[in-house]
């Protein structure tokens, strides 16, 4: 992989990871973690939704930061891919494709993040201890 390709891969990884971390930070700052727990309790099979909401939020913050730094890349990409796919299934799918414009609350943003996470995971597979690429 060339230096330019490495920089591009790192840029995608860092930006996606920081977006996920900011999402968790914002959920805490706005006091929305309990709301997520209520939503999960009403719309999913999760037995302890409030605890799960906190786990999701903390993994977004700590896992997003860890991913941005280039550690535990493949497992974190897997976690976030599953988390986002569940978000698509539970929230966004019923609203269609578009997030804004022709619709709202759609799945297009989540699909882009999922695709980027899969690409980042593939670039780091098999699992390596370093942040390369």
Predicted regions mapped to residue ranges:
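Extended, low-polarity transmembrane helix blocks
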Residues: 1-29, 50-58, 62-133
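Membrane-interface interhelical connector segments
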Residues: 29-48
């Amino acid at each position: 992989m060339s230096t330019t390709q490495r920089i591009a891969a790192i840029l995608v990884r860092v930006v996606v990871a920081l977006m996920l971390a900011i999402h968790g930070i914002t959920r805490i700052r706005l006091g929305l973690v309990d709301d997520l727990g209520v939503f999960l309790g009403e719309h999913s099979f999760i037995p302890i939704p409030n605890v799960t909401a906190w786990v999701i939020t903390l993994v977004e913050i700590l896992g997003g930061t860890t991913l941005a730094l280039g550690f535990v890349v493949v497992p974190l990409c897997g976690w976030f891919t599953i988390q986002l796919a569940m978000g698509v299934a539970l929230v966004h799918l019923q609203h269609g494709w578009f997030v804004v414009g022709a619709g709202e609350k759609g799945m297009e943003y989540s699909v882009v993040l999922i695709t980027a996470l899969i690409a980042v995971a593939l670039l780091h597979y098999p699992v390596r201890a370093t942040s390369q690429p």
